[in-house]
Amino acid sequence: MKRILVLFALFAAAAGYAQTVEKQTFVYAVKQTDTLRLDRYVALTPDSRTKPCLMFVFGGGFVGGRRDNASFLSYFEYYARKGYVVVSIDYRLGMKKAMQAGTLSEETFPEAWITTLAMATGDLYDATAYVCDHASAWGVDKTRIVASGSSAGAITVLMGEYGICNEHPMAQQKLPQDFNYAGVISYAGAIFDTQEELRWTKTPAPMLLFHGDADRNVPYDAVLYDGNGFFGSKHIADMLTERRIPHWFY
């Protein structure tokens, strides 16, 4: 996963662009003691037409990571130069909170895990709603918002799309009516569900999935335990293939 992002960085650096990509930071939500920000990288295109938007969610095992990590900047700038408005977001790190509170144990882990995913997915939805609310001012086409993420961030964007497709109450509450992402890009992600198979009430957005089969942190295929399932990129791709839903898996 990191190798792929590094390749993007090297490509962008080698291109030798003279223009500087403008970055602006906004607060999109305040939740108790957490002030959540997003960085907007302005698209470098000469015309005034509305632009697609690439949203990015960083990784770090839900215990660490930063939206403005220097290793991601060339990735953001690459897409900004291709005409995308790029948005990199904060989100609450549920596992970090549980560890800091001293409440994380083998017994409490399942509940903490579900809470962590709900936190991250809810924050993604709030950030997406913020982008939609500012779409006119930012020149964003709300029908062309792509969600991307790395590792824990990839889990978050996949969970976000999964919630939309299954009409999860949180998605319906936080997002504009009938909203869906134009696409999902997942670098080593997976979907968790409290049942032993994925379900798609609605057709998901086209997906671009990257995942290494030696990943020790996020399952490459499917892991089933005690009635729950954690479904990695291969399993997702196999199901999308069966349903003839557009996707690419590397």
Q: Positions of the model-derived regions?
A:
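Short beta-strand element of the alpha/beta-hydrolase
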Residues: 49-61
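Cap/lid segment of the alpha/beta-hydrolase catalytic domain
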Residues: 66-67, 91-118
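Alpha/beta-hydrolase active-site loop
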Residues: 106-136
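Primarily recognizes the serine-hydrolase "nucleophile elbow" in alpha/beta-hydrolase
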Residues: 126-203
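N-terminal cap/lid segment of alpha/beta-hydrolase-fold proteins
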Residues: 18-49
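The feature captures the conserved acid-bearing segment of alpha/beta-hydrolase catalytic domains
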Residues: 171-243
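Bacterial Sec-dependent N-terminal signal peptides
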Residues: 1-22
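Short amphipathic alpha-helix adjacent to the substrate-entry channel of hydrolases
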Residues: 67-89, 94-98
